Amino acid sequence: LRFDDSGSSDIAGGEITSLTMSLNDGWNLISGISSTIGIENIEDNWEIIIDGTLYGYNGSYVNSDNLVPGEGYWLRTNDEGEITLSGAQQSMKAVPIVPRLDQGNILKISNGIHSNTLFFGEDISEGTRASYSLPPAFPYMAFDARFTDDMKFAMDGGEIQVINTISTLNIQYEIITNAGDQKEWALTTGI
């Protein structure tokens, strides 16, 4: 709030226990209601929410299962429409929890405080690819790691963008898929 003069003011308001909001196609910035609610309390009768795309921010984007009052979240949709947040358990279609690749290779990039896990080498269906998309990066993030197409998944490799504000950068990998003689994975620097 902004006031022209110094002083104090009383501000009154009521508790928000339910909220219906209109969303655009793509990434949307949202906030919750007056109490913490789980992702299962997002009513999505229009079926526009892309599974696994609710992200909070704490210096880096993190998948979230809850909406905490006063916090902002990115949420991706596949069309415009409405969702409803409610403190009451919903009996309508709820948003599923984040999908994960069972058999894909893993690349974990960390600076000791924040980390992102990227997946590669396993094909996923066109219908679930958007679940591996990330909200827009911005220059003042403390940490971010993603493929250059704003995804945390790449089928056959790709260029990775990293934002890191400290000198430490750790990279761990786990090769799960049997590539046989057909694939060679190499991690190189663009410098």
Language model features: what each stretch is:
Residues L1-I191:
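N-terminal exported-region signature
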